[in-house]
Amino acid sequence: MESLPARLFPGLSIKIQRSNGLIHSANISTVNVEKSCVSVEWIEGGNTKGKEIDFDDVAAINPELLQLLPLHPKDNLPLQENVTVPKQKRRSVNSKIPAPKEGLRSRSTRMSTVPEVRIATQENEMEVELPVATNSRKQFSVATGLPRPSCPAMTELPLSMVSEEAEEQVHPTRSTSSANPARRKSCIVKEMEKMKNKREEKRAQNSEIRIKRAQEYDSSFPNWEFARMIKEFRVTIECHPLTLTDPTEEHRICVCVRKRPLNKQELAKKEIDVISVPSKCLLFVHEPKLKVDLTKYLENQAFCFDFAFDETASNEVVYRFTARPLVQTIFEGGKATCFAYGQTGSGKTHTMGGDLSGKSQNTSKGIYAMASRDVFLLKSQPRYRNLNLEVYVTFFEIYNGKVFDLLNKKAKLRVLEDSKQQVQVVGLQEYLVNCADDVIKMLNMGSACRTSGQTFANSNSSRSHACFQILLRAKGRLHGKFSLVDLAGNERGADTSSADRQTRMEGAEINKSLLALKECIRALGQNKAHTPFRESKLTQVLRDSFIGENSRTCMIAMISPGISSCEYTLNTLRYADRVKELSPHSGLSGEQPIQMETEEMEASSNGTSLAVNFKEEEELSSQMSSFNEAMSQIRELEERAMEELREIIQQGPGWLELSEMTDQPDYDLETFVNKAESALTQQTKHFSALREVIKALRVAMQLEEQASKQMNSKKRHQ
């Protein structure tokens, strides 16, 4: 076999076998001794085609080349006398091979040689050795009828002397080559074995690295592997946090994010911090994930905002870059609004109202008090002193679509539009204040009355939107207004401790108002002609803050750093990102990637999961639509029922008057009967209307209950 390359040269005509089994002649174009293969070419359909063939396949299909080489001593043994060799009739080997397909004939491009040759090679390695090779050589010797010459004599013979007998020996010789287990492996098989060995070595190295890392970290610590990945990632980034010395920037819409430190409950559970704030406008969320094979990895998602505050930032730092620039706006006759948004327990009330100690609050260290102090400082300056401005404050909350005055014993208020299409909060009390201390007293009074509830993240969560307004009036006329809003937590209804109707209605109203608020802020930032402020009570009350050229808004997104709150943190950041949609590229250098993973992701499995999630979201969206429709119908019918009830109550003094009439000794009976009939007619109408509204309200409540059960069952199946 070693001398076979010496007998192969360019231009030599040999037989080859195609991938479809067809055998035909082809000319050798090149001989590659290093790869142990030859390149052949042939003409087919007017096109020149070619492929590469291993030396082993050349020898198998062209046995006459092997006969010219020195034979093994076993091949020279004499034939046994009792063995009869049947005479084989000459026949064409091609007769049993199917004709090539039309698609193969019409291909004009050069054929790829790898799949054709390697399939046979892999099959040959799996076969066992059969005693066919010896028989085939014996048949060849008998057929020639000549004794085997020595090698020197055979080297001078031309190939044409043995070409006639070669055609009959194609199939036996092919079997001989197939049955040889010591056959040389192809190049691709060798490469595959090398790749396999490299994979095994890499797995062994990774296993050793994991063992070493496990020794460095406390394995009993929950999520220690994710903690190690986050620590390794943070080493690669440079941190430049925001400080009081950094310059402020003016934005019509300013979107900021604030990260709070881990609280006592999270530290007790040994939770890890999954938020990194490397610069004044950039934030990373290290989302823990698992592959299909349960391999842990991180998906580091980047978000860019106007300002990003880490856990070391104080309320003073946050106020300086968020609400303080807005105070100047109201003295210039504008409307300013500052929102605190986020999950319950993320620090919204702490940021807006001040430090919390149990149920008591130090309101002097919140944005409410800081803004009021700056208002009085600016009011005392000479440029604004001549305006003779008076400072008024209001404090109210919006709970379940209803407005309550926190400074007037939580009286219920009505939101109506006047003839000038201006939204008026009927019954809201405005209180004149002369200094910042008066404001702090009002804040303490209103904060004590605010509605709270229990949620997944906070046992004493604010379940209402609290709006504290500072109004500047000049001779009774509104000059400017600053609205500071502490929004309710953005948990879903399924995340609350109780799943009763009140909780569901509460969560649905919160989500509805938050979506409406986002669209109003986006319309303000994009200078749209239409602002959808009628979608919720919150945006109705703050309507004048979203219209006009001199309107400015700031949103502070509050996030929790714990790994258990990662999903809610991402929801908060996506909501805030949709408000302004800043690109994270602006806060990153060219060398820093947007998303980094510690392990390779499985593209196929991710694609499948995305498709499944999309289908599940479609099913949930239809059920959510039915639920929201039922909730809207309940609120509408509830308002109608309250109106009918008020009408009935207003008729109460009329019945009392009739009763007092009968106490007089000389009352007119005719007058009594007429008034009683009139009152009964009016009351009957109101009672009938109230009865119909109550029936419709009962049906709407049943539909809401059914839609809620369908959503919960769907979530449990997921």
Swiss-Prot record:
InterPro entries: KIF2A-like_N, Kinesin-like_fam, Kinesin_motor_CS, Kinesin_motor_dom, Kinesin_motor_dom_sf, P-loop_NTPase. PROSITE patterns: KINESIN_MOTOR_1, KINESIN_MOTOR_2. A motif (Microtubule tip localization signal) lies at residues 95-98. Interacts with CENPH. Interacts with MTUS2/TIP150; the interaction is direct. Interacts with MAPRE1; the interaction is direct, regulated by phosphorylation and is probably required for targeting to growing microtubule plus ends. Interacts with KIF18B at microtubule tips; this interaction increases the affinity of both partners for microtubule plus ends and is required for robust microtubule depolymerization. Phosphorylation by AURKA or AURKB strongly reduces KIF18B-binding. It comes from the Eukaryota. Changing S108E: Altered localization, reduced microtubule depolymerizing activity and increased frequency of prometaphase figures. ATP binds at R258, G342, Q343, T344, G345, S346, G347, K348, T349. One of its GO terms (cellular component) is microtubule plus-end. Its main location: cytoplasm. It is found in: Cytoplasm, Cytoskeleton; Nucleus; Chromosome, Centromere; Chromosome, Centromere, Kinetochore. The lineage of its organism: Eukaryota, Metazoa, Chordata, Craniata, Vertebrata. The microtubule tip localization signal (MtLS) motif; mediates interaction with MAPRE1 and targeting to the growing microtubule plus ends. Changing S106A: Increased frequency of metaphase figures. Residues 1-248 are annotated as: Globular. This is Kinesin-like protein KIF2C.
